[in-house]
Amino acid sequence: MQQPISIQQPVVNNINNSPNNQANINNNTTNNTNNNNNNNNTTNNIANNNNSNNINNNNEINNSNINNNINNGINNDIDRGGEKKANKLIAKTTKKFNKDMTAYTSGKFFELWRNQVVRDKILGYVRIHNLHYDKRVFKCIDLNNCIDNGADLQQQHNCHRVHNHYHQDLGHNYFGKVSRGIVSLSDYKYYGYLRSVHLIGYEQHEEELIKTIKSLPVGVSTLELSGHLNKIIFKEGSLPTSITNLTISSPTKLGYKSIPSHLKTLKLNSTFNDPLLVQGRLEGQLGIVPLLPIDGAITSLDTGGKFNQPFEAGLLPSSLTELAFGNEYFRPIEVGSLPSGIKSLKLGQRFCLPIPIGSLPIGLTELQLGGTQQNPILTIGCLPPTLTKLTLDNHFNQPLVIGVIPSSLKTMIFGPRYNQPLPPSVFPDSLTHLEFHQNSSYIFPLKLGYNIPSNVSTLLLSFRSQERNVTLGTNSNIKKLRCGGDYLPSLSSDDSTIGAILNSFSSSSSRETFPRSVESLHLNIVNVLDKEINIPSNVTKLIITGNNLQHDGPDVFMVGKKGSKITHLKLRGYEKPICQEMFKNLVNLKSIQFIGAYNHQLGPNCFPPQSITNLEFDCLPSVIPIGSLPSTLKSLRVKSFCTPFLKNSLPSSLLILECAFVRSFIDSYEIVDEIFVEQQAQYAQQQLLQNEQALQAQKQLEIQQQVAQQRLQQLKQQKQQQQQQQDNEQQLDHSIENNDGSIQDDHEHELEEEQENEEEEEDTNNHQHPFLQEAINHNQQLQQKQQEKYLYSSNNSNNYNYNNNSNNNNNNNSNEEDDEEEDLIQPIISKEWLPPSIHTLIIRGEPTIQLPLPESLTNIHIESKNQSILHNIPLMEKISKLVRVFDYESDTNSIFKKSLAICNNINQNQNQNNNNYNNNNNNNNNNNNNKKKNVKK
């Protein structure tokens, strides 16, 4: 096999040739000058011209050789195939560029990058192997024991790491399939984009783990260690200098100078309880030294849940700005023990000791206390005057006295167990955010201007008790209000300051007190809806939640009144079928979201026809009929969908589609609905009937074909008999007339007869009987109709069909029946059922993909665990430019919002282009008119 062309050799030789050529030219120049003194000026000019021409020619040759060698090496190796060779070649070229950057000019990179073939190959392999991830997870395994501590390796090859950590994050004790792309962490050695690594190790792989940590790529700045590392001791130099964020999630031992001074963030495991003083060397002598680097760069430290060791002044780094103690910490805080630069401090649930005055840093801005009911821990003057946020979390239930809260406080948050009366003026006037836990048991009176400052703009209340007494005046500054249960504070309907009620009420009497200025309204309604809800006219966002939400009577539940400004509607637990009359008053409605399983068939024209652009379903078990979605829809999101799309069921205006293709409805939600079961049964019966009809039609067609073939054979036999009689008569006449004929003439006559027979057979094959041709056409029409009606059928052989289950060959009848049932709920992504204008497709699950796809499609977002697409090399080579991979841990809502933003930008750009086009036309018309006027003048 031909070896790849080296890059360095021609570079060195060509670069070294240029000075030699220049030296030779200079020598020739001096010789000519000494020999021809009379023609000194002329000779120098000629030599200089030759010198410059030779140097330029050599440089051009060198540049072309370098580029040709690079491109030929990459193209030849990629064309020969082999993922591993391509990765090595890319890594090699990257290393050469980094090492010999001084020898290259700034234009060499662009000369390589402008090679479209090379660039497309590089980007294709990057997407195929998911090399563009910011974070990777690797697990040490034993190749001799492919099953180690529950690590189920379904594909055994030379892979040393498992980076599919989906099950591990869910608390499972097994792992998924090993990826075929990256074989070890060493493959990332020359890649600078890898920033975060999660290593899962075991005690028996201590040496390998330490070696792996030391050989991490240069760009890695975040490292997380987990697994069984009880006996592993980290010593000086164990961590590379590039690590700035370290998380140790497993029990480990930290030795002298094991924490590097360049570390910025350190999070220890939940079982860490070692002293902060260790045995080490100080000024060349053995002694007790601090574990953490005092003069280091650590800014954030989390000691873990079990830490309960004393510390003195100087043991914590002076650079700390964030410090968090776990729930087991209950040591006293001495004055001066905490660094003065700390801005955020967290104390756990067991901390119940008094806080001495001056013990907290003078610059502290955020404080979180767990506390118990034993001893008072807050006294007057213990909190610094710079505090802006105070959280009394979980078990804290100590009374607050006047003067404890500093005058700088802006945010106050109470936990679920706080139930102490708040005296008047306990909070300063600077307070703007007051929040009680959603399950708070606070039962004492609250009054604006008494124990609630008048400057509060956000008030979040939630009560479990029935005794409530909250008074809010008409001149309040509250812009956001949340209440729980069936309770509404005393408000005036003319209050124009409240901008949002986040959680509200079920009784109709309390709805009369909604302020007119409310723009966002969240109704928490118990089971039954009234026929109409009195919603303020300025509300633009409406959320209605409840369990088994229904309405009384056969009348349609009306949302809002005429002239309503609602643009976004969210329904949770709505159990009635929706219809267009339900949204009759919502002329400005643009977005509808159904939370929970919607177990009804979507009817035709059930949504407003000219306003809806965004539609979301948590679960949609039924088939989407043709014409049920609004014609103006631009984005559709279905979190769980298990039935195939029908052709033309998606509107042509759709730009963004997000669908989570699940194998069954029960996989996503642990409920079985009778309506859904009936719909699935009806759907299966319809499919069986259609299959039976297709079989009957095929049998009839076969019978018709047999009859037609028999008729053709009869006609052919008759024609042959007639032809044979004519031949016999001709032979008889010929024998009488030519008795002296030769054998050669007879042989030629036989050859002519054979040719005539062959021509007759071809004529009969080309000109079939009309009845047979009609039967064949009828069969083709039946097959075409069946393919158009149900796109999940696998009879279409014209398209490329990439199915992850295509390799499973089952010989048993039971397995074939199971495969047929799986095909019923296996959707297909193809050009036939996607709208022609779609540009973004978000796939969750593993559907079947048929090529070609719509030409307007520019982005395909898939999950990192999608095996059917990422590991299908022929498919990825064709759609690699469209694929964008997102991790399962990421928030899909953010991806959906980004896609919506792209959609809006496209619309804005189109409008802007149209406006620019119109403006240009107007300018051209004006210019033409001016020219005509000038000509007339």
From Swiss-Prot:
PANTHER family: FNIP REPEAT-CONTAINING PROTEIN (PTHR32134:SF92)
Residue spans of biased composition, Acidic residues class: 751-763
Compositional bias of kind Low complexity: 13-60, 719-729, 794-814, 910-929
Annotated FNIP repeat ranges: 307-350, 354-394, 396-439, 598-640
Coiled-coil regions listed in the entry: 677-769, 902-937
Alphabetical keyword list: Coiled coil, Repeat
Name of protein: FNIP repeat-containing protein DDB_G0271996
Biased composition (Polar residues): 1-12
Residue ranges, annotated region (Disordered): 1-60, 719-767, 794-823, 910-937
InterPro entries reported in the protein's UniProt record: FNIP (IPR008615), STK_FNIP-Repeat (IPR051251)
